[in-house]
Amino acid sequence: DALRNLRDRTGETTQLIVMTDNKCLILEQCISDQPIKVSGKVGMLVPCYSCAPGKSILADLPKGELQEYLNHVTLKKFTPRTLATGSSLKKELKEVRDCGFAVDLAEGLEGIHCVSAVILDDYHYPVCAITTIGPAFRMPEERFEEIGNACLEAVREIRKKILD
């Protein structure tokens, strides 16, 4: 199972996320074995713009759908690092497209970092995202590339299972 393998590889909680009604919905998760861990509840909804899985999905939406999202969502700050303007979010989404994965530096909750990659269908449309979430002290920026690459590997594994 790709989520379990990713959790074991990174040591952190992993989740499978979809976008619904302009929010991210946790479909499934594998909770970390660490004594201090981060997890959400399956079925929990969070704003897309303030979390890595949401940004990974938004980055690959067609431009018209992204603009529609921005027209319908009020961007507000949850922490000092939340991207709360359309221009700052669009700039970050370009970076996500360029590197292949999204990051969340405590943008939704203080002390929580996430790294995520999107699963695209055969038409390059975002289906869902896989994310690794953990406390900032164990997921510092220095680990983002390593974790991002692990997420991309898990995406390839999941995509092969669900789309082949």
Question: Locations of the language-model features?
Answer:
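Residues embedded in well-ordered beta-strands
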Residues: 15-17, 56-58, 113, 129-131
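Short, solvent-exposed recognition segments
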Residues: 36-108
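Extended hydrophobic
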Residues: 85-154
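Intrinsically disordered, low-complexity terminal regulatory regions
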Residues: 1-29, 146, 153-154, 158-164
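Short, charged/polar surface micro-motifs in flexible loops or helix N-caps
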Residues: 21-24, 32-35, 63-64
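Residue-level structural signal for beta-strand termini and adjacent loop
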Residues: 30-32, 132
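Structural detector of well-ordered beta-strand residues that form the stable sheet scaffold
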Residues: 15-17, 47, 102-104, 129, ...
